[in-house]
A protein has these predicted regions:
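N-terminal subdomain of nucleotide-sugar transferases
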Residues: 1-55, 81
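Donor nucleotide-sugar binding/catalytic pocket of nucleotide-sugar-dependent glycosyltransferases
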Residues: 39, 54-57, 135, 140-193
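Short alpha-helical donor nucleotide-sugar binding micro-motif in glycosyltransferases
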Residues: 81, 146, 271-272, 279-284
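Conserved donor-binding/catalytic core segment of Leloir-type glycosyltransferases
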Residues: 198, 204-220, 226-229, 242
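Nucleotide-activated donor-binding/catalytic signature segment of Leloir-type glycosyltransferases, i.e.
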Residues: 251-272
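Aromatic "clamp/platform" in nucleotide-sugar-dependent glycosyltransferases that forms part
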Residues: 292
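Short hydrophobic beta-strand element within catalytic cores of glycosyltransferases
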Residues: 309-312
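Conserved acidic donor-binding segment of nucleotide-sugar-dependent glycosyltransferases
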Residues: 324-335
Length: 341
């Protein structure tokens, strides 16, 4: 088949959605399909770098400056879609490219399916401080977007149950997003490599390294991990938290570390190169996440594939992943986080 993936976010933007789309593209191509990505322009990449990636003129989304939305070039996108003779369109966003994908599918009279990635109730706070779109309005917006789809892919049971609650009528199926295991197993990474990274981070061999790796934003709830750290340090002083990643909430976390008096126990690395991700996982004793906004959470799978157990806020998805203590520890209330660590 000739498949068009429509998304507002793709590399070089870093996100779980971008990663899942690249994985999907790679695996579909291995099966013999032709895959074309329709996405937004990005100042860090040549618009015409790859003929299979169609970049539509875009501007930063006012509520998420590191995310973009298309604003013109729609007729050109339709023309290109006709030239590529698409058999099916798979949308990955509810915004500009998602709406464009549905419109093009109807114009070409081909099926359109959609993957629902995001619990928007956790994100509407970014739009005019939650004064324009309230959490209670999300279900109506999503239901309207999905009213004319041929099918919806749910990455987890969490999403499936959420769409049932929204009363989305379209046919739904749970299809988890996989990861490319070889990118994280990495047998060529040696103990010396791990020791060198820990030394670079200022973490000794007898210290426990907790790794948080994600976009640094409010909904990732890294602040809960920071808040739990003083209680942990009262019981065990040799614990260090590494916050790997960048994002709008980074200054707040640095300020929080200072207020809590744990600046010497927290390492902020900023953005790390994708090729170093597995090394960071392997250098850590535990991957930690207090996020309650994940619909699936690829970083959990990446950590486990790297051989690193996780400490995370439990949910329906993780309850089916962490089935043995060797894989990690789940907790269900923020006041239980310190005990879980």
């Amino acid at each position: 088949m000739r498949i068009g993936l429509f998304t507002d976010t793709y590399f070089p933007q870093v996100s779980g959605v971008a990663t899942s789309i690249r994985t999907l593209k790679t695996q579909l191509e291995k099966m013999g399909h032709s895959v074309f990505i329709f996405t937004t322009t990005d100042r860090d990449v040549d618009r015409y770098e790859d003929w299979q990636i169609v970049r539509i003129p875009s501007v930063p989304f006012f509520a998420f400056k590191d995310r973009r939305v298309a604003y013109r070039g729609f007729s050109k996108a339709l023309e290109i879609a006709k030239q590529y003779k698409l058999d099916i369109i798979h949308t990955q966003t509810e915004f500009s490219l998602g709406l464009l994908g549905i419109a093009i599918a109807r114009e070409l009279k081909i099926p359109v399916v959609h993957t629902y990635h995001t619990q928007y109730e956790d994100y509407v706070r970014y739009i005019a401080k939650g004064m324009v779109i309230r959490p209670s309005m999300v279900k109506y917006i999503v239901r309207g977007f999905m009213s004319d789809l041929d099918g919806v892919i749910c990455p987890s049971e969490i999403v499936y149950d959420l769409l049932l609650k929204y009363k989305v009528a379209a046919e739904k199926r749970v299809i988890p997003t996989g990861i490319e295991l070889e990118k994280f197993q990495r047998p060529e990474i040696t103990e010396e490599d791990v020791s060198d990274l820990r030394a670079k981070l200022g973490i000794s061999s007898d210290e426990t390294m907790l790794l948080s790796l994600s976009r640094v934003s409010y909904e990732k709830n890294i602040q809960a991990v920071m808040a739990a750290l003083p209680s942990v340090l009262e019981e065990e002083d040799k614990v260090r938290l590494v916050v790997a990643g960048d994002g709008p909430y980074l200054p707040d976390l640095k300020s929080q570390a200072k207020k809590l008096g744990i600046e010497d126990k927290v390492v902020f690395t900023g953005m790390i190169a994708p090729g170093e991700t597995a090394l960071y996982y392997k250098a850590a004793d535990f991957f930690i996440s207090a996020s309650t906004s994940e619909t699936q959470g690829l970083t959990y799978l990446e950590a486990l594939a790297s051989g690193t157990p996780i400490i995370a806020h439990g949910n329906l998805y993780l309850d089916n992943v962490i089935t043995d203590q060797m894989f990690g520890t789940l907790y269900y209330h923020d006041n239980d986080l310190a005990g879980a660590i």
